């Protein structure tokens, strides 16, 4: 059964400006696993796209959960990783999480569907 659907769209330049002013933004938004992947990118633009995509995914996830970010769930509570085929995944107790992330030159977007787990 579907618990919720969340969508988020963000301008990549907005993240670029925030990152240039606040390098600690990476630590605030990304988990340790995500930070490792972020730091392995060699091109600065790819780093910004990755950060924007993960930001959008976490916003979309919190919307699907119905709580928003803050009191009940924080950026660092949500670890988005890629499976062996490259598909984005999030593990969250009690839910099956479906994630889609896309980028254009100017925008990153994500859609998350939360399905209640039968277990």
Curated annotation (Swiss-Prot):
Catalyzed reaction equations: apo-[ACP] + CoA = holo-[ACP] + adenosine 3',5'-bisphosphate + H(+)
Enzyme class: transferase
Cofactor annotation: Mg(2+)
Xref: InterPro entries: 4-PPantetheinyl_Trfase_dom, 4-PPantetheinyl_Trfase_dom_sf, ACPS, Ppantetheine-prot_Trfase_dom
Coiled coil: none
The protein's Enzyme Commission number: 2.7.8.7
Binding-site residues, Mg(2+): 8, 59
Cellular component GO terms held in the UniProt record: cytoplasm
GO MF term list: holo-[acyl-carrier-protein] synthase activity; magnesium ion binding
One GO-annotated biological process of the protein: fatty acid biosynthetic process
Domain of life: Bacteria
Cell compartments where the protein resides: Cytoplasm
Keywords tagged on the record: Cytoplasm, Fatty acid biosynthesis, Fatty acid metabolism, Lipid biosynthesis, Lipid metabolism, Magnesium, Metal-binding, Transferase
Functional description taken from the UniProt entry: Transfers the 4'-phosphopantetheine moiety from coenzyme A to a Ser of acyl-carrier-protein.
NCBIfam families documented for this protein: acpS, pantethn_trn
Family: Belongs to the P-Pant transferase superfamily. AcpS family.
Name of the protein in question: Holo-[acyl-carrier-protein] synthase
Organism: Staphylococcus aureus (strain JH9)
